[in-house]
Structure formats: structure tokens, C-alpha cells
Amino acid sequence: IADIQATLAFARTENLPISIRGAGHNIAGNSLADGAVMIDLSTLRSVSVDPVAQRVFAGPGATLGDIDHETKEFGLAVPTGINSTTGISGLALGGGIGWLTRRFGMTVDNLISAQLVTAEGDVVIASATENPDLFWALRGGGGNFGIVTRWEFAAHPVSNVFAGLVVF
């Protein structure tokens, strides 16, 4: 977090735009901007599971595969997308539709909280009870409200799931 705050302060001082890269899944390179300082979060892939509370905590660079790998040991799943290389940050900030959406809702419906660094460098928590307007904005509103440094999601018990595409 200190590195992010220092980078934001430098960019402000030098009047430089910033760009944020989550897991780097987007093939169009939307996290790139000419002349900008990029904050690359792709190595922040930690995932921890609290099986009793049925909560998952993920770093901003975690992929859906990272999350699935950690939750399956406990028979839990977070409703995410369909591609294991997709980053949780881009997916959650965009809404998140996947195999479990019909049963448990979109990814953002299962977001409990997000820790983020604001443009001013402040570390805040956004949840239904703490900074609720910011929480509402994060839930599908894109990545322009701060730099998320930790996600907290509700996880759900699941048995074996068979899913795939049928092509004729």
C-alpha cells in the first residue's frame, strides 16, 4: 500500500496520469496509457479463505483460477466469470457474470468489502456500512474510484459443478 501511495504522490507532483493494471487479462491493453505511470498489481495474487465465515479475501492481481484453487478445498465458490485467467479486479469492477450467477448473483452481488487507496492516497474501506456511496460505485462502476488493494467476497457451498459450452 505504501508503494501505491508513494507512486500516486509522485504522479501528482509531476502532473502525470496514472493507469492501473490488475491481472492483465484484457487483450486490448486498456490498462495502458501513453505517458502515464502504470501501477501494476498483477503480482498481488494472494487469496485466503475463511471457511467458517464463508468469506474469501483476494489481492487485486488474483485471477479467477487463483480463487477457485483456494476455495475448492473447502467446497466453496465465489460467483465469478467463466475464464480462469480473468482478473478478479476487472471482473468485479465491471459487474461479473459467470456460471454461478443464476444461483448466487453476480460477482458484485457477493462483494462484502473492498480496501482501496484513493487518488489522494488515503486508505479506506468501502462496504454497505462504511463509505456506502463508494461501495455502490465500485460494484460494477469501473475502476475510476480508487485502487483496490483487497477484496472480500461471500463464498457459497457448492458440490461438483459441470459446466461448459455446447456448440452445434
PLM regions and their residue ranges:
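Soluble FAD-dependent oxygen oxidases
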Residues: I1-F168
